[in-house]
Curated annotation (Swiss-Prot):
NCBIfam families: rpsS_bact (TIGR01050). Keywords: Ribonucleoprotein, Ribosomal protein, RNA-binding, rRNA-binding. GO terms for cellular component: cytoplasm; small ribosomal subunit. One of its GO terms (molecular function) is structural constituent of ribosome. This is Small ribosomal subunit protein uS19. The lineage of its organism: Bacteria, Pseudomonadati, Pseudomonadota, Gammaproteobacteria, Candidatus Palibaumannia. It comes from Baumannia cicadellinicola subsp. Homalodisca coagulata. Protein S19 forms a complex with S13 that binds strongly to the 16S ribosomal RNA. Gene3D superfamilies: 30s Ribosomal Protein S19, Chain A.
């Protein structure tokens, strides 16, 4: 369910401050964040943001197509290793 238009997009204040500082100083180091719920803003284009997936920080280079999406969409939290095969070989 999308967020109401009258509320506007959400971004954590501490993340916005880090992004503005990185843009002002032209810093290219990854910005580490645990805020998966924050929306990607146009100011973030060209920055690398390391988003926490519960175990480690996944570096994400923000492109213009990502604007409007959430940071958590690009750092998957679950690993699917496939279903296990049968231990006994089937005879036909």
């Amino acid at each position: 369910m999308p967020r109401s238009l009258k509320k506007g997009p959400f971004i954590d204040l501490h993340l916005l401050q880090k992004v503005e500082k990185a843009v002002k100083t032209n810093d290219k180091k990854p910005i580490r964040t645990w805020s998966r719920r924050s929306t990607i803003f146009p100011q973030m284009i060209g920055l690398t943001i390391a988003v926490h997936n519960g175990r480690q920080h996944i570096p994400i280079f923000v492109a213009d197509e990502m604007v409007g999406h959430k940071l958590g969409e690009f750092a998957p939290t679950r690993t699917y290793r496939g279903h296990t095969a049968d231990k006994k070989a089937k005879k036909y």
